Each structure stands twice: as C-alpha cells, then as structure tokens.
C-alpha cells in the first residue's frame, strides 16, 4: 500500500480538458521545465566566472609573494609562470642538482690556496703559487720561428701632386684668386704670356657727349 502511494506520487496523472480520453501523461523528469533549464545554464556561467576570478587572484597573490621573496601558496605553484633560469633548465634538460666545487679545508695553507691571513689581518702569500717562468726555447725552435717570420709588404702611399692640391692657406681675396689662376695657367700652359692686370685700378667712366 505504501509502495502504491509512492508510485502515485511520482507519476502524476492529469486528464486533458479538450480530449476526454482519460490518457495518463507521465512526467518522470521534474527538472525538464523551461525555468530550470535556463536556471542551470545561468548557474553554470556563474560557476565558471567565479572559478576564473579565483585563479586570477591566486596567480596575482603568488606573483606578489615571489617578488617579496616568499614561497607561493601551497598547491598553487603551478599557477605561477616559471622564471627565466627555471625555463632554461627545463629546455636544456639540466634539472639535476649541480653542487659547487668547494676545496678541502685545512688548518694550514695547502697548494690550492693563494695564502692566508694571520691574527693581525696580514696576508701571507703561498710560495707554491708563485709565477713560474716557462722553459727557454731550444735553438732549433728559435731558428724555425725566425725563418717563419716575414716582413710585411710596405703599404702604397699616394703622393699628392702640386697640380691637384693647393696649399695656399691665405684668405681668399680677389688678388689671391687672380694670382692663383695665373700660376695655374703658367704651370699648365707655359707658352701663354701672362698679362698684367690690376684689379684695384677701376676703369674710367666713359664721357657722354652732349
């Protein structure tokens, strides 16, 4: 009897007013209504927006913590972009831990030390680290090196001629210009007679007859 009541509660029977045929219309999915269909899409959009806001804020907080020298929030380190060195190690495949070489510590200066400081702070260099001169070259090596050396060819230098360059450093005036022109004409054409021309003497004005 209880089972029958539960079945009647889940299966809703309604009779169509227009068609009095007594057919039972079952509605097994109560969430298939139009109002709930729009509501779940709106709820999904709100969920996605809240998730994006959470991820963005977490990445921003991790970036601020990294600038301050702190570790990122636990479980959210994958949100923080890798640094330049970290990405370089990942690209080159050198993820293994490389330890820096540390020489062996001894109470006295060994052959790997340059020296030591005493109690007064004075530095005492190690005699084993002094500069050793290279061995002298043998006569055969010295003669072979002298033969291999050759004197380089002398560089060709162009000698400027007087006709191309004028070394007269006087201020350019009319007299200097005329003298320079006359000198050039004498050098290039010696047969041409030089005529005397005085620039300062201006020609007399012609008289007009009345």
From Swiss-Prot:
Q: Name one GO cellular component term.
A: cytoplasm
Q: Tell me yes or no: is Metal-binding among this UniProt entry's keywords.
A: no
Keywords, sorted A to Z: Membrane, Phosphoprotein, Transmembrane, Transmembrane helix
Major location, coarse class? membrane
Give one Pfam hit by family name: RCR
TM segments? Answer: 41-61
Compartment(s) where it occurs, according to its Swiss-Prot or TrEMBL record: Membrane
Q: Name one GO biological process term.
A: vesicle-mediated transport
Where Phosphothreonine occurs, the residues are 191
This chain belongs to the protein called Protein RCR2
Which species expresses this protein natively? Saccharomyces cerevisiae (strain ATCC 204508 / S288c)
